[in-house]
């Protein structure tokens, strides 16, 4: 949603200023620590860590063990100071406010040495009345308290009962009692990220002065009238009216492409007032709806709303308006004891394909527009249509949601509560209410947001006994839970936004949870709602490992990032899987060993005598393992779309954990810190393809399903091929008769006992051959070429090291890699080191002598740079 505020100055009458003045206080500030031993300039928006780094007082916080070495920063109390002059007489204004869009987090704000307010919530806007205090020359001070010390103090004062958890596991090197502070929860440490509890003015800060009124919030929501079959637009504008007299005027709504030019008379009385405008769109006007990526266009309409008020005051708001409906469908299913759980967009059931979003950096001032676009473009480039903004991070910046609107990425928006119980004392709840009210107002105009969710895993934490809470206090914890998420957050959301569903938690049993008093004994019931699923010990190639659930909003496996990413934050002594650095960077208990165990199920572990080579091979194999595991699991969910087996199934969402990284470390991500694609992300591009053949075995029978997310039916054929590991010559193939693949369906296309299939392919055994398959029509490929391994690759017979070469050429801004191989090669990995960009495909099975792959650079590069940086690896290279 593009939103601009134009403050149009009107002439002053009788010495009385009627305009609204906004004075930015962004830019250069000064900061000092508690005892004044450190004094330095700091940029606003920004944080203390970034200021220290920019002045070279500290090194890169992500380098090696610096997250431990720089813990002192978060334990100190920092003060931000800015001296500024005003070039007009502020006494002529009825109201002057000092506005902070975001303060991180606990602080006392002073103007000219006089306290004007306190802050305790990173997620809300603060506006302080300084009308009678502001001078020609002013000094603002923001005196921060250490968030770590504050959280501990709040916990110590909560003596009535324990509010768990106290501290993160020691392996995370984190801080304690994060649930007692309204701050980015993962800033105290998580199992994929460091602990950097920041302090600073992390969003815009300004002075606003006005005499009549000021427009604080501008919101709009399209509403479809099913009975009349017409679109309406509800526009809400929240004003602070300081004039003692009635303020009259007009509100003019213009949407030229929809032939809308509507004038409304409005009246504003003293106080906080909301103007509601309703625009009815003529039925004869064709309104193009907003669709998720892969299902249609993201059509938006330019709208201008102008307020012309008494005294010549004029406000103008410009925004992009999108029209779409969303419905969460929970209804009985034939042959199943539960309810469905899926989303309809514009009346069409949509399978949500995507991932989970975490903060892109511990230091939000480093998250640039280019970084956001790169990461979100990578989402749609991998055929995803949805992201879940996870509840332990932040409500993302405006540009994030604007890009999601533009790209067609549906957002499951958590409120920022995660993996903990929370206090419900009065001042905490007051702060939360302000937070939720602000965020709903700020975000509800975005079509990309399709649902609100109250928290991440807190229902499960409470009802499944994660924190060994005493049974005698269960009633108290349940009461607190309902108070926070139902009586407050849910109530505020439903009052402020009736256009999208609200879910209490994730995972949850949806309507069943509601019926059971907002908490279910088992929030992971596969017959209801959404589930989170993790299992690192079972064989991930076995599809029976995975839950046949209605909707899976978290699942995944870890891997390490590439060597080129790690190299930037490590030294030579760190380049071993057993190094102190490797252990320090891993924040999941037993995470490194569990990756090796999963690898060993199907691959040989690297055994090179060269330590660096062995380390690089291990990094590669963790990515192979992760990609193959998540592929198997995701394909299981996609093919379960139309199935009910033993009452289970009708899966309509697969959001793996996680999309992006917050730093350079092992995690569940498919995008490394900086945006480089892991092998998993290339796999996601294939397993989330709109049209996909999925192969698996059940009782020695090979089944191939066709899965379609296409909006219409298509005629096609399935080709099944069998290759031997020892030769690039095709052994045998089958071609089905033409069939019609219906839109939005998953159906069996092929089934054959594996012994029968191999019998028709001379010399083939499970160990010596591999199956591939694809969908096509008239010789045109319609789907990715998928494959099915008939045995673990550690038992593959005839698999040789392949000599793979590349000839690189340039076509415009794209580079062409013409590959040649001497042998069949699984998991072919093309790498150009630190040159930013992505390939058209990667991590693939190469069964033919030649293949062409394209490289799309994100920054200017050259053929010679690519040739110098290029390296190719396939599985046999690690033996």
Curated annotation (Swiss-Prot):
UniProt pathway: Glycan metabolism; N-glycan degradation
Disulfides per UniProt: 167-176, 540-629, 732-761, 764-769
Influence of pH: Optimum pH is 5.
Keyword Magnesium annotated: no
Active site: 457 (proton donor), 554 (nucleophile)
Positions glycosylated per UniProt: 35, 77, 297, 803
Catalytic reactions on record: Hydrolysis of terminal, non-reducing beta-D-mannose residues in beta-D-mannosides
GO molecular-function term, one example from the UniProt record: beta-mannosidase activity
Enzyme class: hydrolase
Compartments, as annotated in UniProt: Lysosome
Signal peptide: 1-17
Biological process (GO), any one: carbohydrate metabolic process
Residue runs in coiled coils: none
Keyword presence, Transcription: no
Pfam families named among the record's database cross-references: Glyco_hydro_2_C, Glyco_hydro_2_N2, Ig_mannosidase, Mannosidase_ig
GO CC terms of this entry: lysosome
Expressing tissues: Detected in kidney (at protein level). Found in spleen and to a lesser extent in liver. Not detected in kidney or brain.
Function: Exoglycosidase that cleaves the single beta-linked mannose residue from the non-reducing end of all N-linked glycoprotein oligosaccharides.
Family the entry assigns: Belongs to the glycosyl hydrolase 2 family.
Disease with which this protein is associated in UniProt: Defects in MANBA cause beta-mannosidosis, a severe disorder that affects peripheral and central nervous system myelin resulting in tremor, nystagmus, ataxia and early death. The primary storage products associated with the enzyme deficiency are the trisaccharide Man-beta-1-4-GlcNAc-beta-1-4-GlcNAc and the disaccharide Man-beta-1-4-GlcNAc.
PANTHER family: BETA-MANNOSIDASE (PTHR43730:SF1)
Name used for this protein in its record: Beta-mannosidase
Organism (species): Capra hircus (Goat)
């Amino acid at each position: 949603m593009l939103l601009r505020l134009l403050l149009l100055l009107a002439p002053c009458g009788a010495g009385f200023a009627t305009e609204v003045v906004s004075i930015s206080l962004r830019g250069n500030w000064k900061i000092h620590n508690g005892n004044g031993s450190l004094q330095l300039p700091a940029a606003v928006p920004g944080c203390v860590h970034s200021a220290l780094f920019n002045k070279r007082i500290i090194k890169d916080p992500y380098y090696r063990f610096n997250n431990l070495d720089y813990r002192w920063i978060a334990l100190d109390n920092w003060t931000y100071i800015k001296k500024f002059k005003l070039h007009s007489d502020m006494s002529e204004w009825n109201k002057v406010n000092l506005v902070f869009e975001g303060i991180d987090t606990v602080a006392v704000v002073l103007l000219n040495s006089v306290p004007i307010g306190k802050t305790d919530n990173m997620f809300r806007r603060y506006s302080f009345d300084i009308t009678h205090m502001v001078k020609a020359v002013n000094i603002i001070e923001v005196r921060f308290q250490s968030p770590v010390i504050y959280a501990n103090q709040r916990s110590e004062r909560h003596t009535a009962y324990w509010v768990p958890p106290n501290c993160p596991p020691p392996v995370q090197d984190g801080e304690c009692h994060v649930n007692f502070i309204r701050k980015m929860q993962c800033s105290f440490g998580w199992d994929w990220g460091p602990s950097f509890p920041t302090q600073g003015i992390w969003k815009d800060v300004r002075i606003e002065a006005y005499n009549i009124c000021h427009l604080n919030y501008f919101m709009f929501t399209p509403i479809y009238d099913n009975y009349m079959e017409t679109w309406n637009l509800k526009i809400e504008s929240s004003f602070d009216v300081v004039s003692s007299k009635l303020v009259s005027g007009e509100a003019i709504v213009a949407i030229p492409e929809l032939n809308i030019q509507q004038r409304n008379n409005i009246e504003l009385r003293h106080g906080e007032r909301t103007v509601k405008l309703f625009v009815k769109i003529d039925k004869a006007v064709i309104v193009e709806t907003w669709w998720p990526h892969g299902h249609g266009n993201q059509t938006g309409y330019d709208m201008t709303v102008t307020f012309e008020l008494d005294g010549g005051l004029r406000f103008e708001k410009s925004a992009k308006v999108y029209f779409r409906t969303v419905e969460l469908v929970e209804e009985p299913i034939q042959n199943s004891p539960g309810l469905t759980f899926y989303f309809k967009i514009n009346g069409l059931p949509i399978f949500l394909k995507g991932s989970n979003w975490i903060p892109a950096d511990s230091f939000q001032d480093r998250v640039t527009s280019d970084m956001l676009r790169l990461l979100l473009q990578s989402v749609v480039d991998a055929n995803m249509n949805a992201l879940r903004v996870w509840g332990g991070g932040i409500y993302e910046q405006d540009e994030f949601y604007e890009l999601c609107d533009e790209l067609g990425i549906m957002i499951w928006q958590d409120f920022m509560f995660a993996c903990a119980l929370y206090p419900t004392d009065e001042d905490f709840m007051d702060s939360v209410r302000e937070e939720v009210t602000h965020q709903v107002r700020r975000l509800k105009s975005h079509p990309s947001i399709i649902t609100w969710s109250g928290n991440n895993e807190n229902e499960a934490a409470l009802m499944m006994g994660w924190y060994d809470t005493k049974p005698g206090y269960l009633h108290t914890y349940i009461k607190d839970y309902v108070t926070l998420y139902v009586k407050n957050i849910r109530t505020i959301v439903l009052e402020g936004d009736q256009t999208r569903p609200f879910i209490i938690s994730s995972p949850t049993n949806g309507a069943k949870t509601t019926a059971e008093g907002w908490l279910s004994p088992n929030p992971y019931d596969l017959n209801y709602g959404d589930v989170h699923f993790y299992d690192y010990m079972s064989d991930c190639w076995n599809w029976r490992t995975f839950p046949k659930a209605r909707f899976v909003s978290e699942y995944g496996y870890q891997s390490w990032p590439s060597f080129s990413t790690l190299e930037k934050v490590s030294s030579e002594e760190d380049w071993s899987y057993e190094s102190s650095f490797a252990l320090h960077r891993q924040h999941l208990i037993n995470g490194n060993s569990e990756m090796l165990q999963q690898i060993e199920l199907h691959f040989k572990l690297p055994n090179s005598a060269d330590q660096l080579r062995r380390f690089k091979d291990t990094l590669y194999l963790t990515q192979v393992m992760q990609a193959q595991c998540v592929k198997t699991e995701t394909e299981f969910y996609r093919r379960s779309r139309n199935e009910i087996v033993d009452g289970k199934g009708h899966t309509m969402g697969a959001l793996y954990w996680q999309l992006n990284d917050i730093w350079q470390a092992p995690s569940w991500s498919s995008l490394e810190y900086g945006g480089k694609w892991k092998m998993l992300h290339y796999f996601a591009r294939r397993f989330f393809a709109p049209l996909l053949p999925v192969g698996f075995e059940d009782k020695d029978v090979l089944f191939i399903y066709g899965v379609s997310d296409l909006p219409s039916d298509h005629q096609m054929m399935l080709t099944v091929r069998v290759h031997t590991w020892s030769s690039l010559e095709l052994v045998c193939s089958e071609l089905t008769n033409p069939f019609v693949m219906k839109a939005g369906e998953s159906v069996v296309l092929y089934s054959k006992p594996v012994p029968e299939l191999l019998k028709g392919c001379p010399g083939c055994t499970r160990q010596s051959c591999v199956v591939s398959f694809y969908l096509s029509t008239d010789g045109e490929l319609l789907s990715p070429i998928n494959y099915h391994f008939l045995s673990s690759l550690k038992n593959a017979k005839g698999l040789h090291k392949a000599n793979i070469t590349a000839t690189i050429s340039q076509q415009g801004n794209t580079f062409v890699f013409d590959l040649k191989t001497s042998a069949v090669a699984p998991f072919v990995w093309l790498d150009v080191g630190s040159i930013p960009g992505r390939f058209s495909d990667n991590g693939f099975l190469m069964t033919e002598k030649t293949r062409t792959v394209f490289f799309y650079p994100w920054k200017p590069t050259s053929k010679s740079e690519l040739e110098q940086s290029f390296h190719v690896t396939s599985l046999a290279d690690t033996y």
